[in-house]
């Protein structure tokens, strides 16, 4: 009996170790009203992190604007009910982030002071602070995702530093979604702070560094460069379907058999990020066991 108990304990510890070393799947949610609710997204049990997309207007004295496509209208106060969904996700151990920027929007940091003002706004309206005008209600998000693809290359480092300081009160996870050309045009300064917990690099819509023509050589080369930055974990960002991006889609069987084996031994390998929930019609389920 003692020997059996020892073997059982050893097996449990081994399986826990495997789970700790396994990668996670990250998904973007919020840009299509037909993609299902946030709660349903988390209930699939496929994702470890969900990025709510996007805060499309902020900085430079502008009134911040959250765009959740057909899900709800934040300007009319119709998104506060998402607090229940956010808590449902978090109760399952899933982190829920607010994503800033995106490919379309009006965002710009005009100065370091402007960046600090934006950080204070985010803390009070989405994170652990207090405000009477919280667009998503009283739920506290886990952190902020930087999906910056325009505006300015400056002051994102100050935004990251100020947000990070709030972690003294409650942990604020910082994540980023740079393009795969290295270094990233917009976020290089912010990433150089070394403050980011997770970085999911967009290996799509960028032919020089994505999977192309049956070859993962370019992807692997740029992956190695990204893996060398000072960050917690690096994720492979991909479209979840052919129609989710202009280029860079990798069929699930090819990803599992040819691409992931090239990168999942990297010290900072974190898993796979997918754009987006609307396009994820079985892709995450097909790769989950191998991520």
Swiss-Prot record:
Listed name of the protein: Acidic endochitinase
Active-site residues (renumbered): 149
Alphabetized PROSITE patterns for the sequence: GH18_1 (PS01095), GH18_2 (PS51910)
Subcellular location: Secreted, Cell wall
GO molecular function: endochitinase activity
Main location: secreted
Source species: Nicotiana tabacum (Common tobacco)
Lineage of source species: Eukaryota, Viridiplantae, Streptophyta, Embryophyta, Tracheophyta
One cellular component (GO) term of this entry: extracellular region
Membership in a protein family: Belongs to the glycosyl hydrolase 18 family. Chitinase class II subfamily.
Induction, per UniProt: By TMV infection.
């Amino acid at each position: 009996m003692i020997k059996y108990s020892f073997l059982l304990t050893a097996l449990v510890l081994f399986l826990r170790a495997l789970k700790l070393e396994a990668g996670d799947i990250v998904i973007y949610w919020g840009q299509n009203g037909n993609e299902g609710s946030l709660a349903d997204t988390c209930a699939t049990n496929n994702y470890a992190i969900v990025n709510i997309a996007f805060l499309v207007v902020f900085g430079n004295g502008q009134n911040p604007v959250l765009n959740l496509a057909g899900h709800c209208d934040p300007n009319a106060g119709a998104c506060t009910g998402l607090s229940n969904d956010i808590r449902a996700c978090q109760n399952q151990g899933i982190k829920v982030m607010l994503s800033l920027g995106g490919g379309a929007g009006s965002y710009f940091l005009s100065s370091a002071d402007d960046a600090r003002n934006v950080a204070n706004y985010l803390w009070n309206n989405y994170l652990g602070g207090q405000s009477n005008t919280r667009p998503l209600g009283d739920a506290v998000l886990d952190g902020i995702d930087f999906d910056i693809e325009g505006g300015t290359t400056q002051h994102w480092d100050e935004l990251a530093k100020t947000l990070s300081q709030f972690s003294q009160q409650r942990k604020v996870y910082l994540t980023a979604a740079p393009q795969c050309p290295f270094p990233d045009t917009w976020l290089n300064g912010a990433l150089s702070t070394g403050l980011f917990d997770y970085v999911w690099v967009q290996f799509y819509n960028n032919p020089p560094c994505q999977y192309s023509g049956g070859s993962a050589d370019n992807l692997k080369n740029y992956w190695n460069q990204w893996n060398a930055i000072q960050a917690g974990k690096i994720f492979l960002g991909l479209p979840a379907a052919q129609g989710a991006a202009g280029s860079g889609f990798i069929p699930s069987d090819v990803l599992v058999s040819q691409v992931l084996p090239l990168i999942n031994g990297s010290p900072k390998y974190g898993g796979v990020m997918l754009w987006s929930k609307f396009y994820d019609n079985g892709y995450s389920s097909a790769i989950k066991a191998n991520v």
